[in-house]
Curated annotation (Swiss-Prot):
Keywords: Electron transport, Flavoprotein, FMN, Transport. It comes from the Bacteria. Low-potential electron donor to a number of redox enzymes. This is Flavodoxin. Gene3D superfamilies: 3.40.50.360. The keyword Transport applies. The keyword NADP does not apply. SUPFAM superfamilies: Flavoproteins (SSF52218). Residues 4-35 form the Flavodoxin-like domain. Belongs to the flavodoxin family. Its cofactor is FMN. GO terms for molecular function: electron transfer activity; FMN binding. It comes from Nostoc sp. (strain MAC).
Amino acid sequence: SKKIGLFYGTZTGKTESVAEIIDEFGDEVVTLDID
């Protein structure tokens, strides 16, 4: 199975992947486990 990150919209309207969030907030991240 593959791990894909959830996406969130920023104030500027840009979308960043959860992988970038991990660098800032550590393990406070949710991922979807895709089989």
